[in-house]
């Protein structure tokens, strides 16, 4: 993208925070660990143990007889997790065990209550887990510091921060687990102090804000499709208080609500039909998305802009290859008058990773690959992009591409 559009502003989507993805955002790897799995110790059966008794932040408070729990810190040898010295720190009294699976290995170099120092050879085909087999006093505040960062006050890994240098905007659709989100009210969202941010409820927005402040990047945030009015207002207030006022917020209601593979599309269709917006379910969904977007814009702005005008871009979105649908979204109840931009996702170059070209792709030079992308972009998207741009411009909106 940077090579194809070196003069224009280019943002980036982040990967979902999980234990198996390629990015390494945190110096404390436990922030992206998997949620607790409870086991029956004897006879062993994966994931069939009693429910884990935790506090409000997810830390185990006690274990039943014959029960143990574990969390996968990273899986499948994520390449950004280096071999080396890891320091594991925790509060409480009990038995905490680091375990390397697959072809990985670890050596315990030092161990005392609350601290385990290990030399870890990261498994390329297995797991690195933290296992708790005994709790005398609740085990809390587990941290797994990557090499070179023991007891660091840093939140984000410097390599991760450097990877964002070329971009001017960060889109947090994946960090927020926007697609199929179960979040309805503010307290449904992952707590900032939760033991892991890798939950189906998404990373807490304060981490997103902190990342934007540290990198001086604009923030593109997606509001969960079922979020109530108070959630949206809290989000606006949080951004007003915590986000650098020189940065811009791109505000979008959910993600691809026109796309029926996602629960947000089904939700919008149900709501649209219930409100009698249109007799056809898909059309009712487009119209509901349009009017709920305007409501979200107004709710967020009522607190975000309470003390004066801030940098806010209100984003309506649609389908890149269907300009007619996009016009329905913009024009319903004059929604375009409450927006600043219209966004589409004009994918290009995806075919270079299909079964026919995968064996050849490693032989492509960078200039050749970029030339193929340019051809694919022009041949597949020029007509639609021009139509979408013209339709947006006629309504006073800029056209954005979000993926």
Protein language model features and the residues they cover:
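Non-catalytic accessory regions flanking glycosidase/transglycosidase catalytic cores in CAZymes
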Residues: 1-253, 258-402
């Amino acid at each position: 993208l940077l090579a194809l559009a070196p003069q224009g502003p280019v943002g980036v989507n982040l990967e979902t925070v999980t234990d198996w993805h390629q990015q390494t955002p945190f110096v404390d790897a436990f922030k992206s660990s998997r949620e607790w799995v409870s086991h029956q110790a004897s006879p062993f059966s994966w994931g069939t143990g009693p429910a884990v008794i935790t506090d409000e932040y997810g830390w185990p408070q006690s274990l039943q007889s014959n029960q143990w729990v574990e969390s996968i810190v990273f899986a499948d040898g994520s390449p950004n997790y280096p071999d080396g010295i890891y320091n594991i720190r925790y509060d409480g009294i009990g038995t905490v065990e680091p375990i390397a699976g697959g072809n990985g290995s670890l050596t315990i170099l030092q161990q005392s209550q609350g601290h385990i120092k290990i030399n870890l050879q990261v498994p390329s085909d297995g797991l690195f887990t933290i296992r708790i087999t005994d709790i005398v006093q609740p085990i809390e505040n587990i941290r797994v510091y990557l090499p070179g960062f023991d007891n660091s006050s840093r939140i984000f890994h410097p390599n991760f921060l450097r990877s964002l240098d070329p971009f001017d905007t960060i889109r947090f659709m994946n960090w927020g687990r926007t697609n199929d989100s179960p979040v309805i009210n503010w307290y449904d969202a992952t707590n900032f102090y939760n033991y892991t941010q890798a939950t189906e409820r998404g990373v807490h927005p304060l981490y997103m804000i902190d990342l934007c402040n540290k990198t001086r990047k604009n923030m593109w945030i997606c509001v969960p499709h079922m979020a109530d009015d108070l959630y949206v207002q809290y989000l606006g207030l949080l951004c007003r208080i915590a986000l650098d006022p020189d940065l811009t917020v791109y505000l979008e209601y959910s993600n691809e609500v026109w796309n029926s593979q996602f629960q947000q599309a089904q939700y919008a269709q149900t709501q649209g039909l219930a409100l009698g917006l249109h007799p056809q379910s898909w059309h009712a969904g487009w119209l509901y998305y349009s009017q709920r977007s305007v409501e979200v814009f107004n709710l967020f702005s009522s607190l975000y802009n309470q003390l004066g005008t801030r940098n806010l871009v209100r984003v309506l979105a649609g389908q890149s290859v269907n300009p007619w649908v996009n016009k329905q979204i913009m024009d319903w109840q004059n929604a375009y008058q409450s927006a600043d931009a219209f966004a589409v996702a004009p994918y290009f170059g995806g075919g270079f990773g299909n079964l026919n070209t995968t064996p050849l792709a490693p032989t492509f030079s960078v200039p050749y690959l970029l030339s193929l992308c340019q051809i694919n972009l022009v041949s597949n998207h020029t007509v639609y992009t021009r139509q979408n741009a013209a339709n947006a411009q006629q309504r006073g909106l800029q056209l954005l591409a979000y993926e």
